[in-house]
Amino acid sequence: YFSCLDREGKVFDTDKFIWLQGREVWMFSMLYNKVEKRQEWLDCAVQGGEFLKKYGHDGNYNWYFSLDRSGRPLVEPYNIFSYTFATMAFGQLSLATGNQEYADIAKKTFEIILSKVSNPKGKWNKLHPGTRNLKNFALPMILCNLALEIEHLLDPGYLEQTMETCIHEVMDVFYRPELGGIIVENVDMDGNLVDCFEGRQVTPGHAIEAMW
């Protein structure tokens, strides 16, 4: 897939971003699963999934941020949302194909995501530890949707527990009635407001996405 297109649909850059590659695999899989059983949609989904399976990670399902056209890694797997979109892609693709390998990739990647919740960037975290430790809204926001996306691969009890945790984080930690009902993007590790740039940040798109 190429995702860097101008207004006429012409490719202006051939680098490949795992966020967008994963979204396209998910999209073609979802269209096949829920709209119409069109073979060309399934073929597109499988083609993208096979590219990601071969080139998108380091061999241990640590998903790179970007690749060149041929699949050589450009940016290391520092970004946890590469993992989330890979999980969504292979979860939906497993439904479309019945392929157990795709299901296993989705489950393994989801497990890695959960192991990284306390430090999503891992060894690529550039922040100095201990000075201003913050909890970010983006991960619990997307985990709720992610768990529903791979519901067919999760134990029902585990799914319910994950959903309850995410809803608590969204509604009891980041949603702030005392600020007029806005959702802040960052709080401290105890859930308190922080008077700094990051603590004052609001991302309306994330709030809408979480409520959806």
Residue ranges and their predicted role:
Residues Y1-W212:
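Glycan-recognition and catalytic cores of secretory/periplasmic carbohydrate-active enzymes
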